[in-house]
C-alpha cells in the first residue's frame, strides 16, 4: 500500500525519480514495471503492473455507454519500467494531458499513485479544504 506525498521535479527528458521508499516496493512486487494513464481529475495515475491489470480488466468490462472513458483510461495507458537509476519516463503526451512541465506532486493512493502538476494540485487541495467535507465523512472519527 502506497501513501504519502513527495514533491518531485522532472528532468529535462521528462523522467521522474521514484522515491526510494516506493521504488523498493515496486521492484519487489512488480519487477519495477508500471503503467501510467490519465485520471479524470486532470492528473496521472501510476499503477504497479499487477494492479494495472486488475484495473484494466474492470475498465474493459464497462458497457458501451462508457466507451469514451475506456478510451481515456486504456487508450492513453503507457507501460514503463523503472530504470537502473530509479527513474521512469513520463511521455510528452501524458505530461501535456496533465499539464505537467517540471514540478510535480506524487501521492500514494493505496494501490496506485497520482502524479500532479504541483501548482494545480496545491490549488485544488486548497479549494477542497475550503469546502465542506463529503457526507461520507459525517460519521468518520478523527
From Swiss-Prot:
Keywords of the record, alphabetical order, are: Cytoplasm, DNA-binding, Repeat, Transcription, Transcription regulation
Domain SpoVT-AbrB span(s) in chain numbering: 5-51, 77-120
Main location, first listed in the record: cytoplasm
Q: Does the keyword Cell inner membrane apply?
A: no
Cellular compartments annotated: Cytoplasm, Nucleoid
Gene Ontology molecular function: any one = transcription cis-regulatory region binding
Q: Which GO terms describe its biological process?
A: negative regulation of DNA-templated transcription initiation
InterPro entries attached to this UniProt entry: MraZ, MraZ_C, MraZ_dom, MraZ_N, MraZ_sf, SpoVT-AbrB_dom, SpoVT-AbrB_sf
Q: Which Pfam families match?
A: MraZ
Question: Got a GO cellular component term for this one?
Answer: nucleoid
Its quaternary organisation is: Forms oligomers.
Family recorded in the similarity comment: Belongs to the MraZ family.
Question: What is this protein's record name?
Answer: Transcriptional regulator MraZ
Whose protein is this, by species? Verminephrobacter eiseniae (strain EF01-2)
Amino acid at each position: 500500500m502506497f501513501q504519502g506525498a513527495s514533491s518531485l521535479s522532472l528532468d529535462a527528458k521528462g523522467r521522474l525519480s521514484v522515491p526510494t521508499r516506493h521504488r523498493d516496493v515496486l521492484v519487489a512486487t512488480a519487477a519495477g514495471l508500471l503503467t501510467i494513464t490519465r485520471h479524470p481529475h486532470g492528473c496521472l495515475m501510476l499503477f504497479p503492473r499487477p494492479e494495472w491489470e486488475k484495473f484494466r480488466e474492470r475498465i474493459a468490462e464497462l458497457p458501451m455507454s462508457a466507451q469514451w472513458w475506456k478510451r481515456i483510461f486504456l487508450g492513453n495507458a503507457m507501460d514503463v519500467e523503472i530504470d537502473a537509476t530509479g527513474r521512469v519516463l513520463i511521455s510528452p503526451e501524458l505530461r501535456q494531458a496533465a499539464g505537467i512541465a517540471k514540478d510535480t506532486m506524487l501521492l500514494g493512493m493505496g494501490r496506485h499513485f497520482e502524479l500532479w502538476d504541483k501548482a494545480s494540485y496545491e490549488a485544488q487541495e486548497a479549494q477542497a479544504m475550503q469546502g465542506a467535507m463529503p457526507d461520507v465523512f459525517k460519521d468518520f472519527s478523527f
